[in-house]
Amino acid sequence: RISFYNAIKLICLFIICMTTFIAYANIQQPFSFDEIPTDLVPEYLRMELHGNSRITQRHQCRRLAHFLLWQLLKTAGKSTALLEQIYRTQSGRPQFSVDNIDFNISHSGDWVAVLLHINKSEKSAVGIDIEFSKKRSFSALMAHFAPQAEQEWFAKQLDEEQAFYRCWCLREAVLKSQGVGIVKLSSVMHLPEQLQIFSDYCSKGELLFTDELPFYFAAFINQSKIQPHFYQWNGKELEEKNIKKSLIYQVNE
């Protein structure tokens, strides 16, 4: 039999072996991109783009995402030289050259979020999606990717907006863990009342959804008992933030 003391040690070891960091910020906030050593910044991010507002917004979001990833690597005590080792898979998904550390990026409007996951014992696979609220025909969109049973559940929800973004974000997050696009949204099975997700395009794990941030947020991580650390960029540094309410889904379990 395992003693209480040894059980606590095992739990602590489990948590230490797998750590998840999430940072978010807004491009309207100041951030010192030029502090990142030049050799850690790809050439396309060093350029100052001039064009329409949509192009400049997207470019600034990419720069902010790179900055946040740099900050998270330092927070996690990992070598920032990993930024030099980012490559794209056949599906176009950016990732590190080491299997046990993974990251994923999402942006919506002026908001950017980055997830960094470290798993000392096995391959890491993560995906996130953020969506800044905007007026949409939620029912019509649901009909494009959700099965009838999920649409019926959606029709009963008092908060239509929250219910829609929950259904959308969680799908994007699990698909992004493998670099699969939204063309496969309808392939993800979502059981909202059971808090279960099934997909052929991601591994086993857990997914967190919350509406407590300035945007709707979903993160998939290929592990159980996820305990992500959230950080908000305040214009000078990363500030830890406690998330008080969230939903935790079992994925492919």
For each predicted feature, which ranges?
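Short, Lys/Arg-enriched N-terminal segments with co-localized hydrophobic residues
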Residues: 1-17
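Core catalytic alpha/beta fold that binds nucleotide/phospho-ligands
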Residues: 14-253
